[in-house]
Amino acid sequence: MPRKEDSIPATLRAVSVLEALVAAERPAALAELTSMVRLPKPTLYRMLGMLETAGLVIREPGARRYAPGPRLAALGRAVMLNASLRAERGAILARLVGEIGETCNFTMLDGAQVVYVDRVETAWPLRMTLTSGSHVPLHCTASGKLLLALLPKATRERLTAQLPLNRFTESTITDAKRLSGELSRIRSNRYATDNEEFHAGLVCVAVPVAGKKRACAALAVHAPVSRMPLERALSYLPVLRRAAAAMSSTLNG
């Protein structure tokens, strides 16, 4: 009698393994994955080996735990940056810019940096211009601190320990203990600010965009402090959160 797993195409089994690894939100052991995808250990072990060879899965050094690999992360970024999926997100950002009058952007975590996925610029001539696909640091940007703060604890601590905490302005947080306190406040408040920490004279406020299980992206507004002091930027939190809810619906269907 054919085994159940033999009736499922290998490609679909591989997809289910990748989905399980992403859903785990931390490196998973073979036994954990076996119960998640309901495949025999020998079958799953062989499949993980093939996925590891392809760069879609990585194995922790000195451990028997698996995590999503760099190639899988790159595929996810490519999907998000694909023009065919950006029209609705762009429309949400355009409406937000029309309401606030300042540049708004949609960002995601990309390794130890933030990547700008979508962005709509203000009409003001004085502005900071960044193109989609640009990267900025985590520890001194509103989106970066927000995404870092909302990661699972083990992932957040591991990633934070790797950050160089370079100084960009007099306001940049360069002390690990102080950054940890800032991230704790962000988790409680569910928003983050950049008060001239990345660029002198520039402020930013970011709110989370919910994925199926946790925040997977950030929506932010930024402007010169001479035009939008931080207090005024914070007054737009309700507007940003409404837009973030609309953005979430485009990601989760």
Predicted regions and their residues:
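N-terminal helix-turn-helix
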Residues: 1-82, 86-87, 245-253
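Amphipathic alpha-helical regulatory segments at dimerization interfaces
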Residues: 20, 88-99, 185, 189, ...
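A structural signal for short hydrophobic beta-strand segments in well-ordered beta-sheet cores
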Residues: 57-59, 106-107, 209
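Amphipathic alpha-helical effector-binding/dimerization core
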Residues: 63, 67-163
